[in-house]
Regions:
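C-terminal cap/substrate-recognition subdomain and adjoining C-terminal extension
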Residues: 75-190
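Active-site neighborhood of HAD-like aspartate-dependent phosphohydrolases
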Residues: 1-45
């Protein structure tokens, strides 16, 4: 299992994707003041609520356009993937391991990044566009674990642990994901 932001790539992909979209549709920059206006409410809204506000720049975007941007964005990130983590990914693929990308990033582009890197399964935050503030369930921390348990075969788990699993993250938010596997690697700075 691999985390994405800060683990496979140095940056927060949400910011990178927003910049990617704004270079193609600069008018969407008008939504930045909306996000800034909600910043004082971040403690009340939480990470999921703020993610909904942040993603307002995608309001009324055609889903086919979003899919195309997601594919182009994923391809553009490939040179930025940490070589050391790419080597670990390739070694695990060569060993026949089932490769999982589990990210809190929106699934519409996380899935494309996973496809580019050859993951067997990619899970991100499912986002339903349409409303000004899109609906989503933030795929972070314990929510990642719940979704992994939901989608992976029950036979892969023993006593709540995912057998023969290796996990990689750079974030404390990824610790619940790592705790379901017996072998994990966290590079977390306090």
């Amino acid at each position: 299992m691999f985390d994405l932001d800060g683990t496979l790539i140095a940056w927060d992909c949400q910011l990178l994707f927003r910049h990617f979209v704004l270079r193609r549709e600069p008018w969407r920059g008008i939504f930045l003041p909306v996000f800034l206006a909600f910043l004082p409410l971040a403690g009340l809204l939480g990470a999921g609520g703020m993610k909904r506000v942040f993603l307002s720049y995608l309001w009324r975007m055609d889903l086919e356009v979003l899919a195309e941007y997601s594919r182009e964005f994923a391809a553009s990130l490939m040179p930025s993937i940490y070589p050391e983590l790419r080597a670990k990914l390739e070694a695990q693929r060569a060993a026949g391991d089932f490769l999982i990308l589990a990210s809190a990033s929106p699934e519409f582009y996380a899935a494309e990044i996973g496809r580019e890197l050859g993951f067997d399964l990619t899970l991100g935050t499912p986002v339903e566009l349409g409303e000004f503030f899109p609906d989503l369930e933030n795929h972070k921390g314990a929510a990642k674990v719940a979704r992994l348990i939901e989608v992976l075969p029950a036979a892969w788990f023993e006593n709540g642990k995912l057998g023969n699993c290796h996990g990689y993250t750079d974030s404390c938010a990824g610790l619940p994901m790592l705790e379901i596997g017996p072998n994990y690697y966290a590079d977390i700075e306090a």
